[in-house]
């Protein structure tokens, strides 16, 4: 259900009638009390910890009815009628919204609780006196109409009396009609039956025609069905055709496994092998069925009890595989291993070997006293405007562990044309959670001043100095132009970015200089990253 302010705006724009009855304001089939609060915030409230106040429906409706008056006259008249006044800063904005000149207003609080209007019945009921007057009216009957009704009823009764069968008048059919006339009537009845009733013979003829039609179509449809292929997609392949879902899944897994493994190496024909006469090929022995008396084929050498041990051999310089395979395997020379082509799916890197990320990383201080924090990092680096962290907290922004900003820049094409592209940058304030391989992607760090900011970092000197860190990562320091520079920052290789307290139009050049400095550094030292 819409709020009362939106309903009032709709009625005001469409010039609909707003009915004020007692302490209620009626909008068609809905009504609200006069003192109901809207979601329009009173100017000057809701700041510095003060609770928000909202204009009532009565005060806004009184403003619409007296919009032609000047503000002082309107204030005096509202005070006379004891109605809250719409303040002067809100007057123009509120009237613009109610008249349809603006689609919304900054003073409208969408999170304010809505007052539900009462629904009124739209059925129009007659008054009790009208009902009584209607009941007291005498019913005038036309004598002519009554006479006609009586005549019509008498004629109907007379016709019914004539239609009564009298037994004295019943005669035999042979007495009333001749034999030829009776035969003619029977012939007509039979002809009518043949034309309206379908016999069993007709059913047999129709079924025979349909069967011949189906037989003629079988040959045509058989050829079509033989060339049909079932269309399989990611969705249909997961839909089981039977009650047992495992049959479909196992069949898919077997086909995927067979495709991944490819053909076995021994089944692949050697590409450079010379053609061999089929008559010279030795047939592979076919394993016979199990026979409990066929123990002789498991019998080996008597002296070694079938363990294929060469008593005249030596184990010097041999591997375990050559020992287990026996002497015959040691004597045969193993051919040089040919490179076996791998399937296309195996040529890809395994899933655990992911391709390294090329997204640059920017580290900012985790302290709340820093000018750049996780609350306003996107405003500073992406939108190029400075918004204090305290203001972001008042807006209800939540702090995140890391954020991804999209930097917009112009990139030159080979033809000399420039196109606008966006480049992602990862911003973090907890560098100790970075993986060892992530430090190669760290391109910039915002320095706050104290050296303990770099505790636990790589490349930190034993005395705690971050000089080597600044040799590998570009460092920046953000401060107000009226604040004195930190002594540690003066000693370090840090680019200082100064912001004005009040001149917000100077923020964009400062952050553009940050990106230009970072681009020059990345071209020289981090050219493998995406920027």
UniProtKB/Swiss-Prot annotation:
Found in adrenal and parathyroid glands, kidney and heart. There is a cross-link at residues 198, 301, 308, 321 (Glycyl lysine isopeptide (Lys-Gly) (interchain with G-Cter in SUMO2)). Residues 338-352 have a biased composition (Pro residues). GO terms for cellular component: Cdc73/Paf1 complex; chromosome, telomeric region; cytosol; nucleoplasm; nucleus. A motif (Nuclear localization signal) lies at residues 125-139. Residues 200-250 are annotated as: Interaction with CTNNB1. Residues 260-292, 325-358 are annotated as: Disordered. Changing residue 34 to Q: Found in a clear cell renal carcinoma sample; somatic mutation; unlike wild-type protein the mutant is defective in suppressing CCND1 expression in vivo. Changing residue 63 to P: In HRPT1; uncertain significance. Keywords: Acetylation, Cell cycle, Disease variant, Isopeptide bond, Nucleus, Phosphoprotein, Transcription, Transcription regulation, Tumor suppressor, Ubl conjugation, Wnt signaling pathway. Belongs to the CDC73 family. This is Parafibromin. The gene is CDC73.
